């Protein structure tokens, strides 16, 4: 190889530039502390460093988010703890109010304190931190509760990111706080009529008032009710073997809803010598109790009221109603004549009761126990006796029946909805079978019905409209048809099908199948009549199809009705009708199953005759709820405050509000409410611990990732200095060599 000056020069320049580049790179490493400045310098180092940088940023974001979430959970826990303390204080005050020594003035003072405690609970529920409301769900900018406990947030949790693809909730929605059901609680219901020993005339001798127990006999409950003039002797006619009377049995009607959601009706004869414990065992059997298995507990409280407890936790379907009818003579003489005539004919007093009930249920009554023929005339041994019926109520409510009269104990769901301001609402929650969730507008009636089918089910809808008109509407759920008398020609009937939009056309209708009818559709129908926006001619379906003109007419009528009247399912699954243009309303609504007043027909025996009950109940003179899985904290507290003001120890059928469970019921319910909030505090504590653990773990991970990143990208100063010295030495040697070679000439070799 020929070595020329040009080659030497090229090699010298190349070596010099390489050395300078190495020196520059090492200088950059020493000044910046990292191995590379650009991705092309070392692709593997760059990729690893970028990945670790991303992980560090993610961990930093998680740390910041969990710090913020921790602050929110801490504030939420403090608010919940304070709420539990307030509920405990509330219970102490109610216990104090329940003392017999309190005057009305002292109860009013206690009620004011309870009102302040309730207001404090609402204020805690409206706690905000840094402009965010703790219990508003995901709508943290909106105040969640008003003073009445109405909720304006949502049911959503807020989640904090705790890692790649992982989240953790860190709030309790206000819905859960004030309304969510507790699956570990049982439903407990009660009558509100106290059973007393009526062998004495308690109007004349109120000091002899004595509440009955399970050991008491049925004849003690009827007492002077066997005759109209209260002339019976409490000892001779009831107790002494040689003189006690052979009183007629009582017909007891019971209806209700079992724990599994099915309904029933029954009729049975109760003998005068039967104990109330016998009657309660019979009631338990109607709900499904057997000698080896109980599904409900039927008992009597200290005020002589029957209480029924569902033994399965989380169930929310249990319901009860009962009324009894006993043949009543004018006086003791007539009663003895009836007894003697029965003996002469060779019949029992059970036969006498059956004859009385057969006449009471005959024309024009047609089997409706809410409107019995009374008095009735029956024949015994050829003699005619005019006999009255003594009614024994189990439950009383200050409602109005569908005839416009005040309800009595025989009325069940033939009542108008309750009214509050510009809203009327049913008092029976529609509960989905299986899930125990409240029905919404989209819920199908078939998901709630007590039976297995809607075949033969007809609803009676009575409406006194916003415009002052009255409508008597029949909703046939089997045929999906609504019919009513023509307001302009009552002898003619107008009808239209229950329909929904035809998905194929979008501008015509399809008849909704029986099992697909929703509460929203029923509510729309109610709205039409409440707002006086009804079809004036019959609408016919053709092979299940509704043409465009008829469909458009119905849709426009519904739209017009919704401008003045809102009908929907409220937060407790009840049908609610609101008059939008008024602070009060003259609208009245009644909705009931057409078969609700019909019971098994006589003759009756001492063994219950049982048949299926109605598929639906929307508003009813039914049992009172002492406790249930669902809560409604503010409304519950309002009811308790009212009980304190009225001085009601227990539910009282004669009080201003007979459906209030009283202070004893309040104390039992308060234990549930406090436990409900405590469990949510525990849940929040679990959220806090999870987030705190993530926060701590993130801090450690950040250190570890930073250490790994340092190993990947950070320069080793010792190694860099050695490389610098070596490079400098090599560079200097290169320069020296280049200089020496450049100075050489041919003369050096001559």
Question: Can you describe what each PLM-predicted range is?
Answer:
Residues 1, 9-10, 17-20, 24-27, ...:
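Bacterial flagellar/type III secretion structural subunits and associated motility module proteins
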Residues 1-148, 160, 166-173, 274, ...:
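Amphipathic alpha-helical polymerization modules
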């Amino acid at each position: 190889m020929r070595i020329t000056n040009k080659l030497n020069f090229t090699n010298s320049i190349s070596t010099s530039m390489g050395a300078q580049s190495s020196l520059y790179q090492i200088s950059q490493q020493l000044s910046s502390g990292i191995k590379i400045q650009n991705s092309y310098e070392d692709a593997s180092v760059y990729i690893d460093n970028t990945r670790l940088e991303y992980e560090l940023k993610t961990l930093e974001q998680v740390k910041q988010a969990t710090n913020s979430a921790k602050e929110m959970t801490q504030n939420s826990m403090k608010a919940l703890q304070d709420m539990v303390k307030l509920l405990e204080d509330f219970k102490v005050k109610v216990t104090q109010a329940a003392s017999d020594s309190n005057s009305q003035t002292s109860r009013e003072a206690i009620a004011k304190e309870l009102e302040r405690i309730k207001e404090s609970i609402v204020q805690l529920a409206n706690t905000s931190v840094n402009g965010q409301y703790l219990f508003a769900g995901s709508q943290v900018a909106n105040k969640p509760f008003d003073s009445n406990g109405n909720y304006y947030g949502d049911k959503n949790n807020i989640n904090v990111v705790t890692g790649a693809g992982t989240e953790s909730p860190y709030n309790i929605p206000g819905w859960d706080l004030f309304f969510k059901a507790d699956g570990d609680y049982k439903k407990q219901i009660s009558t509100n009529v106290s059973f007393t020993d009526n062998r004495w005339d308690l109007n004349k001798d109120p000091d002899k008032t004595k509440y009955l127990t399970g050991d008491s006999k049925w004849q003690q409950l009827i007492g002077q009710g066997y005759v109209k003039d209260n002339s019976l002797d409490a000892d001779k006619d009831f107790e002494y073997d040689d003189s006690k009377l052979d009183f007629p049995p009582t017909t007891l009607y019971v209806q209700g809803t079992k724990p599994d959601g099915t309904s029933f009706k029954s009729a049975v004869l109760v003998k005068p010598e039967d104990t109330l414990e016998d009657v309660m065992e019979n009631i338990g059997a109607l709900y499904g109790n057997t000698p080896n298995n109980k599904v409900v507990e039927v008992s009597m409280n200290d005020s002589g009221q029957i209480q029924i407890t569902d033994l399965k936790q989380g169930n929310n379907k249990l319901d009860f109603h009962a009324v009894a009818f006993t043949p009543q003579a004018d006086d003791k003489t007539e009663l003895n004549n009836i007894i003697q005539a029965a003996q002469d004919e060779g019949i029992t007093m059970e036969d006498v009761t059956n004859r009385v009930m057969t006449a009471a249920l005959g024309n024009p009554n047609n089997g409706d126990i809410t409107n019995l023929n009374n008095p009735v005339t029956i024949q015994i041994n050829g003699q005619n006796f005019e006999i009255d019926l003594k009614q024994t109520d189990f439950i009383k409510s200050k409602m109005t029946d569908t005839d416009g009269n005040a309800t009595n104990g025989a009325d069940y769901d033939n009542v108008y909805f309750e009214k509050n301001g510009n809203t009327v609402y049913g008092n029976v929650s529609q509960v989905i079978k299986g899930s125990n969730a409240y029905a919404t507008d989209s819920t199908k009636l078939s998901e709630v019905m007590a039976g297995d089918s809607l075949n033969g089910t007809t609803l009676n809808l009575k409406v006194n409209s916003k415009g002052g008109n009255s409508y008597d509407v029949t909703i046939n759920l089997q045929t999906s048809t609504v019919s009513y008398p023509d307001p302009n020609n009552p002898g003619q009937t107008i009808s239209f099908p229950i329909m929904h939009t035809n998905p194929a056309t979008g501008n015509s209708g399809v008849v909704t199948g029986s099992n697909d009818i929703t509460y929203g559709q029923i509510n729309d129908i109610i709205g039409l009549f409440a707002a006086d926006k009804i079809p004036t001619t019959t609408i016919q379906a053709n092979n299940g199809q509704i043409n465009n003109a008829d469909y458009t007419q119905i849709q426009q009528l519904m739209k017009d009705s919704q401008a003045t009247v809102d009908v929907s399912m409220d937060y407790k699954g009840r049908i609610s009708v609101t008059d939008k243009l008024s602070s009060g309303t003259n609208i009245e609504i009644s909705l009931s199953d057409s078969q609700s007043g019909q019971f098994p027909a006589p003759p009756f025996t001492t063994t219950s005759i049982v048949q299926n009950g109605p598929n639906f109940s929307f508003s009813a003179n039914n049992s009172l709820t002492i406790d249930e899985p669902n809560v409604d904290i503010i409304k519950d507290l309002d009811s308790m405050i009212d009980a304190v003001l009225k001085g009601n120890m227990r539910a009282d059928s004669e009080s201003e509000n007979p459906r209030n469970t009283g202070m004893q019921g309040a104390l039992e319910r308060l234990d549930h409410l406090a436990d409900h909030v405590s469990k949510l505090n525990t849940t929040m504590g679990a959220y806090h611990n999870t987030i705190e653990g993530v926060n701590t773990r993130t801090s450690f991970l950040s250190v570890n990732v930073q250490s790994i990143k340092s190993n990947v990208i950070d320069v080793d100063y010792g190694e860099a200095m050695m490389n610098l010295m070596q490079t400098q030495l090599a560079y200097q040697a290169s320069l020296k060599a280049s200089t020496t070679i450049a100075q050489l000439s041919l003369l050096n070799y001559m």
